[in-house]
Every structure is written in structure tokens, then in C-alpha cells.
């Protein structure tokens, strides 16, 4: 079974169940002190930018 999720502007077909997909997504995130998850970081003009964003899972 493939699980499709949208990550920013990309759709990804994940090889596994919805629960396996969600666990994989959560494992990739960094947890901040207040409990929020950070999914993407990058550097602009010497400063780190953090994008929490949203993840949508379509077939649950």
C-alpha cells in the first residue's frame, strides 16, 4: 500500500501504511521546547530560517 502525503509543494508516495508514514514524518522533525515540530530549516543571508509548515495525509 502506498500512502500519499503533501509536504510543502511536493506530493510524495510513501511505501507503507498511513501510521508508518506519519511516524516517519514525525521522526524527521525537530521538537522545539514548546512542543512544536520543525520540518525544514535553511540559511538565508547568514541566518537560519525555520519552517514549521503543515503536512496533509490524504488517505486516512
Identify the meaning behind each predicted range:
Residues 5, 14, 39-43:
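Sequence-pattern detector for short linear motifs
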Residues 27-60:
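Short, mixed-charge low-complexity intrinsically disordered segments
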Residues 1-10:
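Short aromatic-glycine-(Arg/Gly/Cys) micro-motifs in beta-strand/loop hairpins
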Residues 11, 20-21, 56-57:
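Short, surface-exposed beta-strand-loop junctions and turns on beta-sheet-rich folds
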Residues 14-33:
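Short, flexible N-terminal segments of the mature chain
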